[in-house]
Amino acid sequence: MLTLKIAVYIVVAFFVSLFIFGFLSSDPTRNPGRKDFE
């Protein structure tokens, strides 16, 4: 049961970080070719 909770926390943290990174990267310039993403 503990591993399930850890997996859920990892998935939630992954989606939250993905949303934050996407919002920050698309906020200043909306060009599809981002140079700072590497």
Curated annotation (Swiss-Prot):
What PANTHER family does its record include?
A: PHOTOSYSTEM II REACTION CENTER PROTEIN I
Could you tell me what this protein is called? Photosystem II reaction center protein I
What do we know about how this protein assembles, alone or with others? PSII is composed of 1 copy each of membrane proteins PsbA, PsbB, PsbC, PsbD, PsbE, PsbF, PsbH, PsbI, PsbJ, PsbK, PsbL, PsbM, PsbT, PsbX, PsbY, PsbZ, Psb30/Ycf12, peripheral proteins PsbO, CyanoQ (PsbQ), PsbU, PsbV and a large number of cofactors. It forms dimeric complexes.
Provide this UniProt record's keywords sorted from A to Z: Membrane, Photosynthesis, Photosystem II, Reaction center, Thylakoid, Transmembrane, Transmembrane helix
GO BP: photosynthesis
Role description: One of the components of the core complex of photosystem II (PSII), required for its stability and/or assembly. PSII is a light-driven water:plastoquinone oxidoreductase that uses light energy to abstract electrons from H(2)O, generating O(2) and a proton gradient subsequently used for ATP formation. It consists of a core antenna complex that captures photons, and an electron transfer chain that converts photonic excitation into a charge separation.
Its Gene Ontology cellular component terms are: photosystem II reaction center; plasma membrane-derived thylakoid membrane
Of which family is this protein a member? Belongs to the PsbI family.
One Pfam family cited in the UniProt record for this chain: PsbI
Recorded topology in the membrane: Single-pass membrane protein
Protein encoded by which gene: psbI
